[in-house]
Swiss-Prot record:
Its EC number is 2.7.7.6. One of its GO terms (biological process) is DNA-templated transcription. Keywords: DNA-directed RNA polymerase, Nucleotidyltransferase, Transcription, Transferase. InterPro entries: DNA-dir_RNA_pol_insert, DNA-dir_RNA_pol_RpoA/D/Rpb3, DNA-dir_RpoA, RBP11-like, RNAP_asu_C, RNApol_insert_sf. It comes from Malacoplasma penetrans (strain HF-2) (Mycoplasma penetrans). The N-terminal domain is essential for RNAP assembly and basal transcription, whereas the C-terminal domain is involved in interaction with transcriptional regulators and with upstream promoter elements. It is an enzyme of class 2 (transferase). The gene is rpoA. This is DNA-directed RNA polymerase subunit alpha. SUPFAM superfamilies: C-terminal domain of RNA polymerase alpha subunit, Insert subdomain of RNA polymerase alpha subunit, RBP11-like subunits of RNA polymerase. GO terms for cellular component: cytoplasm; DNA-directed RNA polymerase complex.
Length: 331
């Protein structure tokens, strides 16, 4: 059986794995696998990544969300809408999902607001218990009149997807605790596009570009990794239960990328599909194959006669697109 290529993953320029936004490039992929991976990862990212969300609030002498609060500019409905934008991270080692299931509302560690100085109330004014962290501390909550003491408790839990206030209300058996909708997903945006890459003269592969933005509770890279893990755990039983020799099954060619790269080295620079100027400059410099090109350092290529900055950048990009590298500079 012909094995599949092992692809590489590149993070976008000037991005890191801890950022809440990232563009991830998967290449080279077998034809058709760009959409297969892109669509499945996108669906899981949008609906199945675990997050943390407000599910109830408690205010002294307030029993429902339509009640007004003296000395507060906003009504309670607007305050709840503002609080739904609160991004909280719960340390699962301190207060994990299993412990949350076993903890009653009376013993739940709550986030507390005790605001008496008047003025603008922000998320930074919320006191958090051990294991809870507020990400968007500049978030606006309400405006409180001077001399008014405003108190509130916030209940936050771990979950997946979306839960309506009615579903949350069924779990609350306490007086004066108001249930709210919960949107647990830390992923704000997912998009992907698939393009072609010519790896050899007769072979064209897919390139998948996956764009992910999160609310900061998890990084974009972590969200992508989690979505892949979820898919893997769902696919694995299909193989293990239907195929006895699962461990002997080899699908990915571990040497495919290397061998493909080696074979592409010997071919003409014509395959790079360079602009006329870049192509002619290389030819005049006696560079006719990719092998001859990758045997040069960046400094040596920059010194090629009549090769401008634009042509230099084009050549470097064409080499990187084939997962090849130039010769290292000697110290």
């Amino acid at each position: 059986m012909e094995k599949f290529l092992r692809y590489n993953i590149q993070i976008g320029k000037d991005q890191n794995k801890d950022a809440d936004y990232g563009v991830f490039v998967f290449k080279p992929l077998e034809r058709g696998f760009g959409h297969t991976l892109g669509n499945s990862l996108r669906r899981v990212l949008l609906s199945n990544i675990i997050g943390h969300s407000l599910f109830a609030i408690k205010i002294p002498n307030v029993s429902h969300e339509f009640q007004s609060i003296k000395g507060v500019k906003e009504d309670l409905t607007q305050i709840i809408l503002n609080l739904k934008r609160l991004v909280v991270k719960i340390d699962q080692e301190i207060f994990g999902e299993e412990e949350q299931k076993e903890t009653s509302l009376e013993k739940w560690p709550t986030l507390k607001i005790d605001f008496s100085k008047g003025g603008v109330l922000k998320a930074s004014d919320i006191e958090t218990p051990v294991g809870f962290e507020i990400i968007n501390k500049d978030m606006y909550i309400a405006t409180i009149e001077s001399g008014v003491k405003f108190k509130m408790e916030l209940f936050v839990k771990t979950g997946r997807g979306f839960t309506t206030f009615s579903e949350n209300k069924e779990l609350i058996n306490a007086i004066n605790v108001i249930a709210v909708d919960s949107n647990f997903s830390p992923v704000l945006k997912v998009g992907y596009k698939v393009s072609d890459i010519k790896t050899t003269k007769n072979e064209i592969n897919d390139v998948l570009e996956l764009e992910v933005a999160t609310n900061g509770a998890v990084s974009a890279a972590e969200a992508v990794a989690m979505s892949a893990k979820i898919l893997l755990e769902h696919y694995k039983p299909i193989v293990t239960e239907l195929f006895d020799n699962y461990n002997d099954l080899r699908i990915i060619n571990e040497e495919a990328t290397v061998s493909s790269s080696k074979s592409s080295l010997a071919i003409s620079i014509d395959e790079l599909e360079l602009s006329v100027r870049s192509y002619n400059c290389l030819k005049r410099a006696g560079i006719h194959t990719i092998t001859q090109l990758t045997d040069k350092t960046k400094g040596e290529i920059e010194k090629i006669r009549n090769l401008g900055k634009k042509s230099f950048k084009e050549i470097i990009k064409k080499i990187q697109d084939r997962n090849l590298k130039l010769k290292e500079e000697q110290n």
